[in-house]
Each structure stands twice: as C-alpha cells, then as structure tokens.
Amino acid sequence: LSPSASSNNPANDWMVKSAEYVLSEMSPKVFWGENAPRLASKMGAPVVKRLRKIADENGYTFSIFKTKSLLHGLSQVRDRTFYFFWKGDTVPLFEYINIPPTMIADDIRAVVNDKNDPMSQILCNEKKPSDDPYYKFILDSIEGGITHKEFAAKITKTTNVQDYIEEHTTYNKVAEWMREHGYDNVARKCDRAYHKLKAGGNIMRKGVEIPKDKIGAFVGHMPTSIAHPDEDRFLTVREAMSLMKLPNDYQMINAKRSLNHMCQNVPVTTAEHPAAMVKKYLEGKLD
C-alpha cells in the first residue's frame, strides 16, 4: 500500500486491477491477497472503498483480516493485513489463533547448518560481532571483559548495542574510550550523538543486535545485524531464512545480494493461518 493511500495513487493499482480482472473474468469462490497493516487503518480507507465497490459490482463480499506474527508462534513483531473477496453476501468466521511465540535465540540455535547446504555456508555479514567498536566497548568497558556468548546469556531481551550503551552511560564517555583505542571515526560519531541527544534530538541505531526473546520486523538492516546467540558471528543465510519460516530446503539465487528478497515477503507461518481458513471455507467447514 502506498503511504499516501490515495484512492487514485498508481502504486495501489495492482490491487484494484487484479481484483477487477479475477472477479469479473474468473469468478472464483474466494480471491484473497496480503498487504501492509496500513490497509486496515484510516490511511487505507480510500483503497478499501474501491475494493468494496468492485466486490459489490461482481457479487462478492469484501473483508479484512489484520494480524500480527506474534500470534502465529513467530518471535517477530510484524503486523500484516489480508484481504478477501467472498462470492455471495456472507463471510466465514475464522478460527481464533494465538500460538505463543518461541524465543528468537532458540529459533536460531535450532537451525541445522548442513555442510552440503549452500545456504548454510554463506554468512549474511562476514564480520565478527565482537569486532564492532560499540559492542567491544560493552564487552570490555561496561561488562569488564566478557565474551559475546557470556553477554548473550546474561541479557533477558533482544538487545541493540547502542540501546544498551545509552542505558549505562553517555556518548561523550564512549567517545573517550573510542579515542583511547584508536577508533577516531567512531569517536566523532559518538561526539555528534552526544550533542544531538543532549539537545533533545534522536539518532539512528542500526548496530549489532543480540537476539534473545523476540525481534522487530526482519527487514532492512536486520539480516546483517543479528548475531548468533552463542557463536561470535552473524547469521547464515539458512538461519536468516528460518526467521521467515521458509522451508529448510529452500534455495535463494544470488543469496548474498538478495537478502532483502526474503524480508519483503510475509512470514510463512503468518500467511499459513488465513490459507488454512480459506481451505476450510472451500470445504464447508467454517460457519
């Protein structure tokens, strides 16, 4: 959904045109799709109005199902919206779902990195997490010289290294440590961060993420920022794909350059429930 959500925004035409064609030319019992959570908000109302009109004109009833991945057993904070065109004037009642999410650290540990699996041999980020200057400051200065594994065991929630630093000290002190250890460029960034925060501004925090309970949406910088919970490395492509619940034998073409492709899809388990509900509807098993 285009952020503007204007009913005539060309970026939203694919939903309208696909619905017009499928409902008028193919006339299925149900036609459904997936979109951003904005579709179920006030911002998406103009698009929803157009889709409802198409439904009415073709003898269908339109409905929306908004959900979050945490309800589908996935330890990822990620809301999604599914939309449906049901032939006739009624819609089925979906079964409620609330599968407790697992711990993200345990999800990563459970992945088997097979030496014969190409996706298990490719790291999303070939650097070492503990070589990151901010994380090194935490391990050596704040924590007194512990290992990545020890820090990961200590924390109780997924931790961004910059958030952790801000909870324990200020960037002007971090800048001093950075200069003492030869990280002059990082020291200058710390100086800017200190003054910006002091003035009431905000900064971007895209540093190393140490996984524990759950993570935010697995998009953007996340695939290259999440560390393994035990080993001082970043995730393999196989481990990254597992966070989207992709099949264990799934292979990506040009995986290193295509990391964002896995992120731009709805997690498999999130889509699994509405798919199961559509199947039950077609089998006459829903009210």
Question: What is the predicted role of each segment?
Answer:
Residues 1-198:
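Class I S-adenosyl-L-methionine
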Residues 145-287:
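C-terminal target-recognition/interaction regions appended to catalytic cores
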